[in-house]
Swiss-Prot record:
Allosterically regulated by S-adenosylmethionine (SAM). The gene is MTHFR. Coiled coil: none annotated. This is Methylenetetrahydrofolate reductase (NADPH). Changing E463 to D/Q: Loss of S-adenosylmethionine-binding.
Length: 656
């Protein structure tokens, strides 16, 4: 039975556990364990490769380098998210000695790779060089990588500073030394990749001598090889045969470089000391000032090369040197049929690839549109909910004090946000209009589309289309929705809009609606909710901590679940009243941090946003009768009707 509302029907404070966000170090809970939905979440990279090799399923992977600026870091993380949609098996991040690569700077190799794993859910290889580094430095970098959740290292010697190679006293001089050290110090924790040179390393005495060095690296513990770029398939085929003859049996992945510009080609060739075939030079030289023409030629060349490699049966996958660009590589993969935007999701929310989160399969619904924030606020947990959220009075969410961490920043710059949300606001209705335009996809009066809100930096989720008309109607009237889901009763898990999990299952949802609204509307809503008491769970809270709910105090409400062959029921999304009090701090702060601070202090626009922050309520509603038609729209309609109904005194005044 649903509990009676705690708090009065008018909006008086009920402050128990309401205002503080806390920052305890771990979540104390005992969790039921359920079988994982996605086997790849529990496999290390070399196991994923082995399974693909056995099945004949080709993979692709992508290389990126750390950006030079903070803005570049924000853009690169956005690119990770976009390119993750195509299904890379892994990415790798290069090690730039000049850029303080092991530091906590947002442009460091370590931080970019950590962000890819933790916040983008990408299996990631971190390059690491031993050139000009002491043993203690290298070991420290490896321990830090492990602590950040990185499990794959590409062990490289690195390029010398200047033209001449100088040995480092107390350090390592060759990649094989680094491989041996990783295995000696960390055992089997890391999967190790090493570089192969299809034409031999430019500093090697001979091709055969270089192959012997490669064999030494594999014998020391390397799990697979990624090659330097090359331009002709026969170069790779000869290399693979030579490796086989040498007794090298691990996977060898060819490195592919789609030519994207004349200057980038010259720079890469200079660094790699490779010779470009004359027939390629003959094509590029006349069009060297036409970037589009060179890019198109590079795409055609890469597609042809990849087709020849794949047809040989010698290639387990393809590794692309992207130069931090996406267009050419994406186009090549699409033409090869390897870019697969599978709408199916292992779970309804974005995954992290950190090893300690591999069992995680339950989250509160509130962070559905801010998964990176949720991961940040729970990064100190020692274990993660698996099977059920559980009863907990202390979810221990870390505080979100810095809204400008590069992986949490809006992808849109200030100028673009002002064009979307308004250079100047004149009333609360101006704010309502922004929400409506975000939902409708129509441009504002200045011709700019609203593609994000402070609570959602992405386009609308596919399932929002099922509720679009209702959402538009209520947002026009000051019910400012930031999260919603329709009720679902047994849709196939393969459904392209609401499906998730393995095939052959069925998914279910309770209708959910979360929104900001004025105090007057909240008071009317509470009056209406009395007649829905046994069906609808509600929770209203404002920035001051006034808190009214009819939900059981410490009891989460499962609002998404799935039934799959041979498995227990999975409940990946809950509405948890305790977590909601932590979420409300973040949700209210976003009014100011993301929107209000776009305007000058004391300006009318800033004042309007501040008023909403100070006076509105954050509300969530759950319709527990998921097999029936969603009643939440009727609840809202009844509320608006009550709000607009003339008062008794007004009617008496108007009477003749």
């Amino acid at each position: 039975m649903v509990n009676e509302a705690r708090g009065n029907s008018s909006l008086n404070p009920c402050l128990e556990g309401s205002a503080s966000s806390g920052s305890e170090s771990s979540k104390d809970s005992s969790r039921c364990s359920t079988p994982g939905l996605d086997p790849e979440r529990h496999e290390r990279l070399r196991e994923k490769m082995r399974r693909r090799l056995e099945s004949g399923d080709k993979w692709f992977s992508l290389e990126f380098f750390p950006p030079r600026t903070a803005e570049g870091a924000v853009n690169l993380i956005s690119r990770f998210d976009r390119m993750a949609a195509g299904g890379p098996l892994y990415i790798d991040v290069t090690w730039h000695p000049a850029g303080d690569p092991g530091s906590d700077k947002e442009t460091s190799s370590m931080m970019i790779a950590s962000t890819a794993v933790n916040y983008c859910g990408l299996e990631t290889i971190l390059h690491m060089t031993c050139c000009r580094q002491r043993l203690e430095e290298i070991t420290g970098h490896l321990h830090k990588a492990k602590q950040l959740g990185l499990k794959n290292i590409m062990a490289l010697r690195g390029d010398p500073i200047g033209d001449q190679w100088e040995e480092e006293e107390g350090g390592f001089n060759y990649a094989v030394d680094l491989v041996k050290h990783i295995r000696s110090e960390f055992g089997d924790y890391f999967d190790i990749c090493v570089a192969g040179y299809p034409k031999g390393h430019p500093e090697a005495g001979s091709f055969e001598a270089d192959l012997k060095h490669l064999k030494e690296k594999v014998s020391a513990g390397a799990d697979f090889i990624i090659t330097q770029l090359f331009f002709e398939a026969d170069t790779f085929f000869r290399f693979v045969k030579a490796c086989t003859d040498m007794g090298i049996t691990c996977p060898i992945v060819p490195g592919i470089f789609p030519i994207q510009g004349y200057h980038s080609l010259r720079q890469l060739v200079k660094l790699s000391k490779l010779e470009v075939p004359q027939e390629i030079k003959d094509v590029i030289e006349p069009i060297k000032d036409n970037d589009a023409a060179i890019r198109n030629y590079g795409i055609e060349l890469a597609v042809s090369l990849c087709q020849e490699l794949l047809a040989s049966g010698l290639v387990p996958g393809l590794h692309f040197y992207t130069l931090n660009r996406e267009m050419a590589t994406t186009e090549v993969l699409k033409r090869l049929g390897m870019w697969t935007e599978d709408p199916r999701r292992p779970l309804p929310w974005a995954l992290s690839a950190h090893p300690k989160r591999r069992e995680e399969d339950v989250r509160p619904i509130f962070w559905a549109s801010r998964p990176k924030s949720y991961i940040y606020r729970t990064q100190e947990w020692d274990e993660f909910p698996n099977g059920r959220w559980g009863n907990s009075s202390s979810p221990a969410f870390g505080e979100l004090k810095d809204y400008y961490l590069f992986y949490l920043k809006s992808k849109s710059p200030k100028e673009e946000l002002l064009k979307m949300w308004g250079e100047e606001l004149t009333s609360e209705e101006s704010v309502f209009e922004v929400f409506v335009l975000y939902l409708s996809g129509e441009p504002n009066r200045n011709g700019h589309k609203v593609t994000c809100l402070p609570w959602n930096d992405e386009p609308l989720a596919a399932e929002t289309s099922l509720l679009k008309e209702e959402l538009l109607r209520v947002n026009r009237q000051g019910i400012l929705t930031i999260n919603s889901q329709p009720n679902i009763n047994g849709k196939p898990s393969s459904d392209p809009i609401v499906g998730w999990g393995p095939s052959g299952g069925y998914v279910f949802q309770k209708a959910y609606l979360e929104f900001f609204t004025s105090r007057e509307t909240a008071e009317a809503l509470l009056q209406v909710l009395k007649k829905y008491e046994l069906r609808v769970n509600y929770h209203l809270v404002n920035v001051k901590g006034e808190n009214i709910t009819n939900a059981p105090e410490l009891q989460p409400n499962a609002v998404t679940w799935g039934i799959f062959p041979g498995r227990e029921i999975i409940q990946p999304t809950v509405v948890d009243p305790v977590s909601f009090m932590f979420w409300k701090d973040e949700a209210f702060a976003l009014w100011i941090e993301r929107w209000g601070k776009l305007y000058e202090e004391e300006s009318p626009s800033r004042t309007i946003i501040q008023y909403i922050h100070d006076n509105y309520f954050l509300v969530n509603l759950v319709d527990n009768d998921f097999p029936l038609d969603n009643c939440l729209w009727q609840v809202v309609e009844d509320t608006l009707e009550l709000l607009n109904r003339p008062t008794q005194n007004a009617r008496e005044t108007e009477a003749p």
